Amino acid sequence: NTYPVFPLCHLQPSRTTMTTLKTRKPCITTISEICDSEDHTKNHQHTKLPPVIKDLVANWSSNDCFEHISPVALPSHPAIIDIIRQTRSLLFPGYFSAAKLHQNNLEYFIGQETTDLYDKLTEQIMMAIRHDCRRMLQPCTNCEERSHRLALAFIETLPQVTATLATDIRATLAGDPATQSPDEVIFCYPGLLAISIYRIAHELYLLKVPIIPRIMTEHAHSLTGIDIHPGATIGPGFFIDHGTGVVIGETTIIGKDVRLYQGVTLGALSLPRDAGEKLRFIKRHPTIEDNVIIYANSTILGGDTVIGANAIIGGNIWLTESVQAGLKVMLKRPELIYT
């Protein structure tokens, strides 16, 4: 069977339109001519880019915009995410790797993963230190030797981090009847994911590793909606239920066996515009003592605010003052109106 072929210009114009058509470009009838025409259009538009490029370069040459134009590379965001993944595979063997683990190969697996993690982390720490030194105009700190030392110090904290995360998992199992097993908590719970990444980042923060801890916790923030600053101090047995919208500021101190629900903010009071640098190392966020429960959407602010042990803070509470140990803070029951 044959099928009729219709050229792109098969329609014949009427006499009334002939005058108009004479002024138009010749009709394109082949694919190659169409492609050539498109390439011509693209190339013509490219000629308009150089002035924009010059404006961008001029912006970066001023002090009004931010750039990183330097022979020293910044830490790699994808590489740091991979470090998180690999660290979690060490903290929870068998959960986040494709390897089939048993007692005969476990030590080999842990050895290989730990060595690989050490090398990757050393490289990223060295980039972070070099960038920080150049940005702050600091004298040379022997960044290569320092990065190896810091990476090793971090690796040495992993047994304790594993033990602390085990208490967080047990707290989740004890506090949430909806969970069926530790596997479900480890695989599925955004609260534990955010806490795990926080505990990894916190150890690097304590070692004064630049920028990498914050990249880690902000990655967790983007995944879970839970914002925990790596500088916060959080005790064992920590449980965040549901999690979305939780904020925990840099100088927050949280005791052991504390439970938070979604939307809780442990934050700082509003600061004057020029006060940030002066208060950078001052305690700005609350202290939550042992065995406290804070229900959904409550906000607790201020560095002098202390929530005493075993206190319960109800939902939708706004607090800027301390609460004694063992007290319950609840809103007065609102009046419902039916119409």
What residue spans do the PLM features occupy?
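Terminal amphipathic alpha-helical/low-complexity segments used for targeting or macromolecular assembly
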Residues: 5-11, 18-215
